[in-house]
């Protein structure tokens, strides 16, 4: 009996370790727009983008670190966890909730810049997702909000998606009932938009 137990112990010890996925990581880092709020599992843009990349023969693995309701302050607090993933590329999609809450754009800019700088220092290529807001937030605030993304992209030489929800926001064909969050069809448009900016980086 002891011999059998010993043999089983040895066999367990020599079991091969799980093989880690060797593909470089593209990190989808954002809020509900990245998390895939309100759509069936697999319908969000990170999952759709993974299927697109697989079909095109790109050997990358997408990690979804989207959290619904997150702000740039929340993203900054999660920064080390994001770096621990050791991404090669990050799609940084944060700021919409800051704008909807009327957070000062100086704070938005400082938070985004801290994340951008940390990613770049770690050798991560950053794609910045730009945002806009409903005009009832006031023309001056909306203009200042939009300029944060343009300014940071220019300052840090980042590929910029001018408006992450281009063709989606406000269109009931592509959104949930809130006219903001994409539905599954809306995420097809978002995925294509991200891929358009991402693919030139992958081809380098």
Question: Which sequence ranges carry the predicted segments?
Answer:
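Alpha-helical cap/lid subdomain in secreted, periplasmic
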Residues: 21, 48, 58, 74-204
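Serine-esterase "nucleophile elbow" of acetyl-processing enzymes
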Residues: 17-68, 78-86
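N-terminal helical cap/lid subdomain that shapes the substrate entry/recognition surface
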Residues: 69-73
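Bacterial Sec-dependent signal peptides at the C-terminal "C-region" and cleavage site
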Residues: 1-23
